[in-house]
Amino acid sequence: MIELIKEMFSYHFMVRAVVVGALVSLCAALLGVSLVLKRYSMIGDGLSHVGFGALAIAAAANIAPLYLAVPVVIAAAFLLLRINQNSKIKGDAAIALISSSALAIGVVTVSLTTGMNTDVSNNMFGSILSLSRADAVLSIVLSAVVLLMFVLLYPRIFAVTFDETFARATGTKAQLINSVIAVLTAVTVVIGMRMMGALLISSLIIFPALTAMRVCRSFKGVVICSAVISVVCFVIGMAASYAFELPSGAAIVIVNIIAFAAFSFAALLKKRA
């Protein structure tokens, strides 16, 4: 395993892929804890479909993908919050409404213009190895911003996650914090789509948090454990992808599934002991 990892890091494109992927995995895991506890974990899936629609339009218009997708997905995140808070359409229904609409727009755009070319396929199924240097630099900068914002707002995110009503009563601007979480999630989804694809990006948000919750009981413990699990599973998944010539996104998800099963079994044994 060590020799395999050394061989991986001997290639510049693999180093770039691992650095970007590890940062995206870390961001997704940290945000995932709050989203899972707030029963909003499928927002990643919904926003990824919006991202696919935006990337399809960018490809058709010959626009740099991230420059169009980031603002569009952020706008979709705000729209999701507004629909969820101010209408009778709640939670998963709001996500399904926006995601299916955006996915349909993306599919129609692809059909009428470029067709299912390599870029569209990469955005749908993921291909972290196709990251350009410019995409990698932008992804690293955006990931650093997400991590910094999460650390700075950690106490408020904790308060809003567990008891939004009490958080409002103590002076926390809950709506603003929810908006920040939505924006950070949107940015993470967009930069993560290149690695995982629109079909699998939500797994980076859901699996590490659920796995950590099998063995940890405090919010801080779950956050730290989730972050470690996410990065470790990513590295192992990339190594498996490299060794067995598997799609990187699918390999990473399978490793996360194995980790979830192992932690669930460990929690069961601990409960019976």
Q: Where in the sequence are the language-model features?
A:
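Short loop segments and helix-boundary regions at transmembrane helix junctions
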Residues: 33-116, 212-224, 241-244, 268-270
